[in-house]
Each structure stands twice: as C-alpha cells, then as structure tokens.
Amino acid sequence: MKFFMFMFFMTNVIFSGIIAFGLIQYNSKKNISNLKIFLLSLGLGPAFTSIILYWLLFMFPYKPDVFYFVAVLIFYFLILLIIIFHKKLNGNKNLINLIKSFYLFKQLIFLKKKNNIKLFLIVIIIIGLVFSIYPTFNQYSKGYLLKPLEGHDVQSYGTEGKIYYKEKTFKHRYNGEHPESGYIRFSNHSPLFPLLLTWEKIAGSIMGKDTDYYFKSITPFYGLLIVIFVFSVLSIKSVYLALLGSAALFSSSLFFIKFFSYHIDLFRIYFFSTAIIFLALSIETKDRMQIILFCVTLGFSAASHSIGAVVSGFSVLIFFLFYEDEMINRIKHFFSIIFSLFILGGFHYFYDTIWGTGWIF
C-alpha cells in the first residue's frame, strides 16, 4: 500500500498541484476562484501524465522504464520552473492566496453561515447513513483494491496498459491486434485511460513493485471529483441546490455501483461534463481562464473516449458560432482550441484514421 500511496500522492496531488499553480497565475479576473481551479486540477494531473507518456512512447519507443519515468518528472519540473521564473507571473502572491483560501474557507460560501454549516453536516450524516445500510456497501468497500480487474471494458484497458508497458510502443494499437498475446482490440478509443496502468507499471518497475492498485483507484477518485464538480457548479445558483444535487447523485444505485467498480465511465464522464460546462462559461463570460479550462478539458474528453472526440468537433463549432467578439479574436480562439485539442487528444484519432485502424470510418 505504501507504493500505492506514493503513486497517488505524486500523480494526483503533486502533479495536479503544479498544474493548478500554473493555471492560477492566469486567473486575473477571478471569475472562477483559485480554490475551484485547484479542485478541478486534481483531475488534470493523471490525465496530463498519461498524455505526456503517450507522446513519449509515440516519439521515443522501446526505451527503458527509467527513461520514461525520469522524462515525466523532468517535464513537470520544467513546467514548475517556467511558472516560477516567468517575469509576468506573481506566483508567490497567488500561492499565498490559495493557501489562505483553504485555511479561511473564503471561497466556500456555505461555510460562512452557521445555519448552512448545520445543513451541510446534516446532509453528510444522511449520506453516511445511506452508505452504512446500503446492502452492497461492504462488498464494494472491503478489499476494493485487492479485487482483480473484472468486467469486459476494464479487462481490455488493463490488457492494453500492460502491453504498452511491456513493448513500449503503440505498434499493436494502430494495427488493431497483438499476435503475441492473441489480443484483438474491440474499440478504437484513445489510450489515455490504459496508459495510467502503464505509468504505474513503469514506476513500479523502478521501485521493485508490481501492482495495479493505483489504476484501480481511478474510478472512485474521478467519481468523487464529479460530486465536487456538481457541487461547485450548482453552488453558483444556490448552496441548497448544490447540496441537494450532490446528494442526489448517490440516490441512484447505478452511480453508487459505478463509484465502486473498475470502469472508464466516471473518468470520461468527468472530462466530458467539465468540457461542456466550460464551453458555456467561455461563451458567456469571455474570460481567458474559462477558455483555457475549456481547451484542456475538451482535449482530455476527446482523449478519454471516442464519444468525447466526436462531441469535441461540435463543441469547437458551437464556440466559434456563438462566441461574440471581433472576428479576428474568434479566429484566434478557434485555432487555439483546435491546437490544444490536437495535442491533448485529437492527434491519436487523426493518426489512427490515416495510418492506423481507420478509427470509426
């Protein structure tokens, strides 16, 4: 479990924190709080790590494990250096403000009033009681990480992740089959999700560990982020609506079961949902930070699943048609979104369509 905690802290906390630190520097208009940016960024660390690994394996195949592990660390270290030493950034001030926002809870409106605190605690207690009496709760909670990967989709993704790790190339991915193991792809989604297992295997080989605990933790982690995101969005209108909406997610047995199952659904739904929300916010506020977050989440939505890739094309078109600004600015934003979409997820589908399996065509 120590290795799992190390992987989780490094990828989901440290890497996500570096990304959050960079995004906060550009949050000049404060249309979105620094705390909300940090919470959103918790889901970006694993995805960024996966896409970095994708480009490393694509451009530098067949390298030893230490090469990819060190390359990822260097990438984040360079990002941190750029953030710290860029003359236009004031990292110290923004970092202090972020710490204050956690300490004083200035950004959380519902904690400013005693009545709201009581309501929040009551809702938490109710959710806890529901969990405690739910018939299958113990089955899903006890030994969750010790259960083998089971289920059609996740077994496929797990197999792919191990193949990427063993071969250090995407050759079989774009051929559609892997003769050595007899594995044949059943879908043409981007390898973003299975690469998280590849990343765990690479780190584990260096530290003498061979587990898949971190990969298994991805589903509940992004399930929790969905709950946080729903609360964050609905709290703009009403704190009570946010509490009700967050609690309502667990009123469905399907969401609860998905929360404690090995699957890609919550991972891809998180990026799909955030991309749609930031599309609307970008058009409404014309805020630079909202547009940046739209670019990032849209790219990862495409990279996580083919449905996200298809919807991303329509999302870019909607942005261009409904974003009210001078034509030159609309064109600039349009190509910025296209570029980020291509780098973060679209390239895979372009390459697969032209030189690979043909994707969905």
For each of these PLM feature ranges, what is it?
Residues 1-113:
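Membrane-embedded, hydrophobic transmembrane alpha-helices
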Residues 15-20, 267-284, 297-298:
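Specific aromatic-rich, kink-prone transmembrane helix
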Residues 32-39, 209-213, 230-251:
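Transmembrane-helix signature of polytopic, membrane-embedded enzymes
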Residues 53-55, 159-162, 179-208:
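Short hydrophobic/aromatic helix or loop-helix immediately within or flanking a transmembrane segment
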Residues 77-83, 214-237, 274:
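Transmembrane-helix motifs of polytopic, lipid-linked glycan transferases
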Residues 136, 321, 325, 332-361:
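Membrane-lumen/periplasm interface segments of specific transmembrane helices
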Residues 260-267:
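Short acidic/glycine- and proline-prone juxtamembrane loop motifs at membrane-interface regions
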Residues 279, 290-306, 316-317:
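Membrane-interface alpha helices of multi-pass inner-membrane proteins
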